């Protein structure tokens, strides 16, 4: 099923490709690092990125680990929220605590 618009598959394909390119990985490199057989790795990641297939949750989790992004980033439908998730994930623990305290105090 092709992923376009606001479908979950479409969201994953955009975020997956964005994170992969940011790390400078080929589709094959990402697939192999996530545990796919080297002979299908490139094709499988290509199909995920094109929205032909969507990875199941265990595969999405493995891809997220390789890409150093939280799995929530791959499923986020808002660009702004996706960037916040990524920034929070990459921030040092003390900064995360400060950010949480600031956000909770304004609630």
Residue ranges and their predicted role:
Residues 1-22:
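A short, Lys/Arg-rich alpha-helix, primarily the initiator
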Residues 79-107:
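Interfacial/linker helices and their anchor residues that mediate assembly or domain coupling
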Residues 30, 59-67, 74-75:
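Hydrophobic micro-packing sites on short alpha-helices
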Residues 24, 42-43, 50-65, 81:
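Short, basic-rich loop-to-helix N-cap that marks the start of a DNA-contacting helix
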Residues 44-47, 73, 87:
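Residue-level recognition of specific faces of alpha-helices
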Residues 23-47:
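Short alpha-helical DNA-recognition segment
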Residues 34, 49, 59, 75-78:
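DNA major-groove recognition helix of helix-turn-helix
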